[in-house]
Each structure stands twice: as structure tokens, then as C-alpha cells.
Amino acid sequence: MSSDSEKGRFSLLGLSEPELSAFIIHKASQANVEVSVIEDVYPCSPMQENIQMSKSRSHDAQYRMVAINHITLPRAGDSIDIHRLRHAWQQVADRHSILRTIFAESFDHGRFCDQIVLEHPDINFHEVSDVNQTPDGISFRQDSPAYLLTIMPLELDERGVVCRIEIDHTIIDGWSYGIMLRDWARAYAGKLREEGPAPQYSDYIAFLQTENHEAHLQYWLNALTGVQPCLVPGTMGLHVKRTQSSRSVPVLNIRSPILQAFCRKLKVTVFNVVQAAWTMVLRKYTGMDDVCFGYVAACRDLPIGNAEEIVGPLINMLVCRTRLDSLQSTSELVQAMQRQMIENGRHQTTSLGAIHHALKMRGLRLFNTAVNFRSFRRDKFQEHGIAIEVFEDRRNMEVSKISLA
């Protein structure tokens, strides 16, 4: 490798030339790959490190998204070409480097792990007779990206194929999934190469390295001064064995005309109303007037070029803290949620781990509940005559489990 190319590709590591050569050789050995196939190496984001650390503590932990997708062509009688579909996926992986990324430990450099981008890794792409027989939680190989695509052709009268995608949250979030499917459809139609270069996940890592982390952390310390752990079950005589679980409860009419009118009047969002509702639930079950919980920030509004087009986990868990004794009405509470959310958004890159450490929580959890808000509509991507529809999606609770584990 030439030193000039090394400087350009591996600049986010901040190593000198002698250190870099030894580092790359070591990483190749760790990952069981050849040095020649490594395109880039850079640090992980705080969220990625959080996931990797959680998995290392519990081998049973599964921080993955599983989705079943129906892929069709519009005209009756047309059939999906599996070979072409596989080639289209390869184009998507070529375009988005996070889909060619593996991970290796990096304790000796003050980090838990680093991510290694490979030039042309093997893609886990299989054809089966029944995708429902593919078990969840398969073991991914260390030397290939952490996802599996399983294709099942449908009967001729049903048209198309079913594709099951199981993918680790270390390399994707919900927003990214939509970009990935859209580009897959474009690639199958032969249109993806017409697009300009895509922004890469390394752009996000580079941005994080320029952030004033001390100033952001100080904001959170000020915002959380005097906060106490807000845990459910609380202190109201509820003595139950501690377990980890998640439940999904459909909320009907969440976008009713009455609620929409209420939000317009106060100039708030439906999510602010959901936050306010959960705040009141926490007061009920903890007996506390000063409560806090987590919520997910997409971080797609960061000042990074085309951040909305980056495939990779930009999400972060932020803290909502409310002192209910200072608020007089439900309207005031909802408006307080909005003001706090706007201010928190200016400091959204601070990791929850850094906040815990700065607060000297000493192994305690600040909260054990989190609120995420997304519509349960079916995602459908139609590009140039090919349609990909997500009709089973098991990603909804994963983000909360990542950050609360």
C-alpha cells in the first residue's frame, strides 16, 4: 500500500505512517482477511460500540432487525430474475460501504472496537423454498458483513419473490432500511449507476470527531442536575422479579382530527403528546414528580452533506427529563416536551454512556423505559417498474433494547 493512499483512506484513525502499517496488518489478522481486501478502517460510533459491548456481555443478546419483503414486477407474467436481483444487491453494497463492513476489537487503542470496510466481501445471499423456516439469530461470520438475505420464489400466479432480510443493528437503523430497499429496486431496474456518489457512514464518524463533546456533555450535566434514577416498577410496593421484555400496544386514532387540531393549536407534534403521556404514566408508577426516560433521535438533521442518504446507524438515545411539580396543565406539559426536544436536538450526538459516566451513576441505570414513535404503515418502494413491500417487520423495539441493556 502506498503511504499517500493510506493517509486518505485511514485518516480517521489519526495514526502516524509507521503505526498505521502495523495497525492494518494487525486488523487483517484479527478479522481473518487479507490486507489487500481492506478498503478502510475507522472507529465506531458510540451507538455501535454500545451494541458490540452489549453483545460481548451476553451471547444471547440479539440486536437485529428481521423483515420480510415482497418483491414484484407490475406486469402479469413477468418474473423476478434471481441472478439479476443478487447482482443488484451487490451494486447496493458497492454503493454503501457500511454493507461491506465487519468489526474487530481495538482495546489497545482506547476503543472497544473498530470497523473494517472490505472491498468485495462475500454476500450472504441464499435461495430457499420457505423463508419462514429460516431461524432467527443465526451466527454471522466474522469475516463477512452481519446480514443474511434469503430469497423464496413464489408460485407463478402469485408473482415475484419473498425476501427475508436479517441484519445487525450495528450496521443499520430504520431510516437506512428504506434507503437500502429503494436503491435495491433502482439497481434491479438498471438505474442505480446513474446516481451520484452516495454519502458514506465514515462521513458521520468524521463529523463526530469534529464535535465539541465537552460542551455537549456539559449541557446534559446541567439539564440532569439532581436527577434520580426513574425505574419501573417504582417504589409503590411493586415487588417483581427483574426481567427484560418488550410489548407492543397498538394505539388507535393516534392521528385523529381532534388530536391533530390540538397539536396545531399548541404548535407541537404528536410525538410531543406521546412523550407527555408517558411522563404522566411514569409519575403514576414511580411516585416521582421528577421523571426521565429515553427517546430515539434519528440524527438525520446533523450538518453533514446528504445525511438523510447515509446508510448506517445514526440514531442516538436522548434523555427526556421533566419536573412535573412546576407545570400547571397538560398543554404546558406538551409544550415543555417540544421545547426540551428542540434544545436536546442541538446536543444529540452525546452518547448515553458518556452521560452515565459523567453523572457518576456507578452501575445504576438512569431510566429503564424509552419511547419510540413510528407509524405501523407498510413501507413500499416502487422504482422504475419494480416494487418492494415490507409486510412483516420486527425492528420496532430493537433501539430501546440496545440502549437500555
UniProtKB/Swiss-Prot annotation:
Any one biological process term the GO annotation gives: secondary metabolite biosynthetic process
Pfam families registered for this protein in UniProt: Condensation (PF00668)
Protein name as annotated: Nonribosomal peptide synthetase ACTTS1
GO CC list: cytoplasm
Function: Nonribosomal peptide synthetase; part of the gene clusters that mediate the biosynthesis of the host-selective toxins (HSTs) ACT-toxins responsible for brown spot of tangerine disease by the tangerine pathotype which affects tangerines and mandarins. ACT-toxins consist of three moieties, 9,10-epoxy-8-hydroxy-9-methyl-decatrienoic acid (EDA), valine and a polyketide. ACT-toxin I is toxic to both citrus and pear; toxin II the 5''-deoxy derivative of ACT-toxin I, is highly toxic to pear and slightly toxic to citrus.
GO molecular function annotations of the record: ligase activity; phosphopantetheine binding
Record-linked CDD domains: CT_NRPS-like
Native organism: Alternaria alternata (Alternaria rot fungus)
Region (Condensation 1): 39-383
Family indicated by similarity: Belongs to the NRP synthetase family.
Other notes: Gene clusters encoding host-selective toxins (HSTs) are localized on conditionally dispensable chromosomes (CDCs), also called supernumerary chromosomes, where they are present in multiple copies. The CDCs are not essential for saprophytic growth but controls host-selective pathogenicity. Although conventional disruption of ACTT2 could not be accomplished due to the high number of the copies identified in the genome, the high sequence identity among these copies of ACTT2 is likely an advantage for RNA silencing, because it allows knockdown of all copies of this gene simultaneously.
Domain notes: NRP synthetases are composed of discrete domains (adenylation (A), thiolation (T) or peptidyl carrier protein (PCP) and condensation (C) domains) which when grouped together are referred to as a single module. Each module is responsible for the recognition (via the A domain) and incorporation of a single amino acid into the growing peptide product. Thus, an NRP synthetase is generally composed of one or more modules and can terminate in a thioesterase domain (TE) that releases the newly synthesized peptide from the enzyme.
